[in-house]
Regions:
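Conserved GNAT acetyl-CoA-binding A-motif
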Residues: 105, 113-123
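Basic/polar N-terminal segments that are highly enriched at the extreme N-terminus
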Residues: 1-4
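Conserved acetyl-CoA-binding loop-helix of GNAT-fold acetyltransferases
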Residues: 91, 97-110, 133, 137
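Acetyl-CoA-dependent GNAT
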Residues: 6, 10-16, 21-81, 87, ...
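Residue-level recognition of the GNAT/N-acetyltransferase active site
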Residues: 74, 92, 125
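Conserved active-site alpha-helix within GNAT-family acetyltransferase domains
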Residues: 102, 126-145
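Conserved beta-strand-loop-alpha-helix junction that forms the acyl-donor binding cleft
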Residues: 121-131, 150-153
Length: 153
């Protein structure tokens, strides 16, 4: 578990290499294959260069980046404004249960609210009960009768 002070900030170009290593850990945790570090580095660079498509917040302590959150804002007529979406949230295994995830979500919520978002959502794996409990503590609730659907483009 991390013991030094965590600082939350938006990712910068100088964070890309270290961030890609943490994203690799996420892919291993979720058993996603194959991991293409160069493609992920290019995507992170794109997000950093164009915050209008999304933002990446990082949690850093003296040991390095301990977690990240990727989010974006999209127009949503149902909610009557912008909808904030959390695309990814990952905290390094040895930094979990230390408040890192909560700090990342809080920072993203503040920034997205400042951008005009009126609601926030994310998908959580049905089997990931621990994550569901975490989000519930932060005030999130399952939307009854709805499920996330996907299609590759």
């Amino acid at each position: 578990m991390t013991t030094s002070t965590i600082h939350i900030a938006t990712a910068k170009s100088s964070d890309i290499a270290e961030l890609v290593q943490l994203i690799r850990q996420y892919w291993e945790y979720e058993q996603l294959k194959p991991f293409d570090g160069d493609a992920i580095a290019n995507l992170v660079a794109e997000v950093i260069a164009h915050p209008e498509i999304g933002q990446c917040w990082i949690a850093r302590d003296d040991a390095g980046i301990q977690g990240y959150l990727v989010g974006s804002c999209v127009p949503n007529f149902e909610y009557g404004g912008l909808l904030a979406l959390i695309a990814d949230l990952y905290v390094a295994s040895d930094a979990r249960r230390s408040g890192v995830g909560q700090q990342l979500v809080h920072a993203a919520e503040l920034a997205m609210r400042a951008r005009g978002c009126v609601h926030i959502a994310m998908e959580v794996a049905a089997k990931n009960v621990r994550a569901q409990q975490f989000y519930s503590i932060l005030g999130f609730a399952t939307r009854a009768g709805y499920s996330m659907m996907h299609k590759a483009l």
